């Protein structure tokens, strides 16, 4: 099954997403800030990355751009920022999909399946 990296500074959210994805049979690794996202993406062989936009150290947009320097792995941005301009910037930084919080876990799983 696919290997997914989940990075968000909200640990409870990471735990919930991880639980749901593991129940679907995915392998899941986690991180909690933008720098960790880039390091883990570089070290791991991930099939998909779920990346929060607003995180400590470097934000999700910067992390996404840095990951794009060495990988074409599908990236889903997961964020509370729902303005159209935020979504457009996310796509311009290299995201493949953009989901706003609060979100439905069934929708997230469907979007993951669509990208894999």
Walk through the language-model features, giving the residues of each.
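The feature encodes the CheY-like receiver
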Residues: 14, 56, 83
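Active-site beta3 strand of CheY-like receiver
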Residues: 44-50, 55
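Acidic catalytic/metal-coordinating carboxylates
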Residues: 32-36, 59-62, 67, 86
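Conserved phosphotransfer cores of two-component systems
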Residues: 42-46, 66-73, 93
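Short hydrophobic/Thr-rich beta-strand motif most characteristic of the beta2 strand and flanking loop
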Residues: 25-32, 40
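Active-site residues of response regulator receiver
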Residues: 8, 52, 79
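Charged docking surfaces used in two-component/phosphorelay signaling
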Residues: 15-23
